[in-house]
C-alpha cells in the first residue's frame, strides 16, 4: 500500500479528496501544514489522519525550515509527498532529500505557471484550461508532467467560476489518477533527466483515457418532474441517424422531455439492428414491443 505525506497551507481539498477516494489503495498517512489553524487540519483530524504544524520562524531560512519539516516527517511512514496549495517554493534541501514529490497546478502547464493562474487564463482569452500534476523540482511549475485534465472556459466566467470548475472537474480527477498510477507502480521518474514515463498510458483504438466534447442542443423538460431543469448535448458532426437532430413532425405538441429522448433513442437503436422496415415501442427505456414487415 502506497502511503502519502500531504503538505498544504490552506484547505487541502485535494488531499482530503484523495484520503476519501484512496485511489489504487493509497492512503494519506500524515498531513503537514506550515500555517497555524489551516482548515486542512480539521478535515484531516475528522478522518483520523495524523497532523503536524511546522511554521517558519521569523528570519529562518527556507532551507532550515524544510529541514525541520523533513525531521518531523521522519516520524511517519510514507512513500510519496503530495503538495496541495502549499504556498512555499521548495529548495533542493527538500527536493533532494524527500521521496518523489508531486504538486497540482491549476492550469495546463507550461501555460500560465506561477500565481494567479485563473486570472492569467481569463486575461489571455483562452477557451480551454485545466490542471497539471507534475513532479516538483527546484524550478517552480517546471517539473516533468505526470497527467493533465482539461475543462472549458466560458465567455461569462469570473475567477471564482473557473476556480471551482478546475477544482471539481479537473483536479479531483487528475490527482487521484496520478496517485493510482503511482500505487500501481506505473510511474517512473528519472530525477537526473527530469522525465516521467507512465507504463500503459497508450493510445490506439482503445486508449487509456478519453476526452469527449459535446455541444448544447436543447434545454429539456424532465418529464414527470417538470420543476427540474435538464438539457441534451450532442456531437454536431455525427452523420448517423439520431434522435437529437431529427425534426419533430407533430407540430403543436410539447417538445421532447428527458424521458422522451431516452425512449426514442432506445427505439431508434433497436430498429437499427434490422435490415427490413421495423417498429419498436419503448417505455421508460424498457422494450415493450418490436416488429418487422415488408413495409412500414
Predicted features and spans:
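Short beta-strand segments
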Residues: 7-8, 84, 281-283
Amino acid at each position: 500500500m502506497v502511503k502519502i505525506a500531504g503538505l498544504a497551507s490552506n484547505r487541502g481539498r485535494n488531499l482530503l479528496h484523495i484520503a476519501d477516494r484512496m485511489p489504487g489503495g493509497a492512503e494519506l498517512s500524515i498531513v503537514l501544514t506550515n500555517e497555524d489553524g489551516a482548515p486542512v487540519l480539521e478535515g484531516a483530524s475528522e478522518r483520523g489522519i495524523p497532523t503536524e504544524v511546522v511554521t517558519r520562524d521569523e528570519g529562518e531560512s527556507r532551507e532550515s525550515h524544510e529541514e525541520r519539516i523533513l525531521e518531523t516527517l521522519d516520524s511517519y511512514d510514507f512513500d510519496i509527498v503530495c503538495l496541495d496549495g502549499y504556498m512555499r517554493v521548495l529548495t533542493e534541501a527538500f527536493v533532494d532529500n524527500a521521496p518523489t514529490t508531486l504538486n497540482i497546478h491549476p492550469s495546463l502547464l507550461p501555460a500560465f505557471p506561477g500565481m494567479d493562474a485563473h486570472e492569467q487564463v481569463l486575461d489571455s482569452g483562452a477557451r480551454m484550461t485545466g490542471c497539471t500534476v507534475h513532479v516538483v523540482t527546484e524550478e517552480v511549475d517546471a517539473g516533468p508532467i505526470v497527467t493533465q485534465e482539461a475543462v472549458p472556459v466560458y465567455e461569462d466566467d469570473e475567477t471564482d467560476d473557473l476556480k471551482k470548475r478546475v477544482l471539481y472537474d479537473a483536479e479531483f480527477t487528475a490527482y487521484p489518477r496520478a496517485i493510482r498510477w503511482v500505487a500501481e507502480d506505473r510511474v517512473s521518474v528519472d530525477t537526473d533527466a527530469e522525465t516521467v514515463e507512465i507504463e500503459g498510458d497508450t493510445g490506439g483504438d482503445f486508449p487509456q483515457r478519453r476526452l469527449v466534447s459535446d455541444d448544447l442542443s436543447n434545454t429539456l423538460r424532465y418529464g414527470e418532474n417538470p420543476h427540474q431543469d435538464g438539457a441534451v448535448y450532442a456531437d454536431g458532426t455525427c452523420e448517423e441517424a439520431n434522435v437529437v437532430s431529427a425534426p419533430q413532425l407533430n407540430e403543436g405538441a410539447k417538445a421532447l422531455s428527458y424521458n422522451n429522448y431516452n425512449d426514442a433513442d432506445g427505439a431508434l437503436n433497436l430498429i437499427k439492428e434490422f435490415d427490413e422496415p421495423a417498429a419498436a415501442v419503448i417505455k421508460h427505456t424498457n422494450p415493450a414491443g418490436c416488429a418487422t414487415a415488408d413495409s412500414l
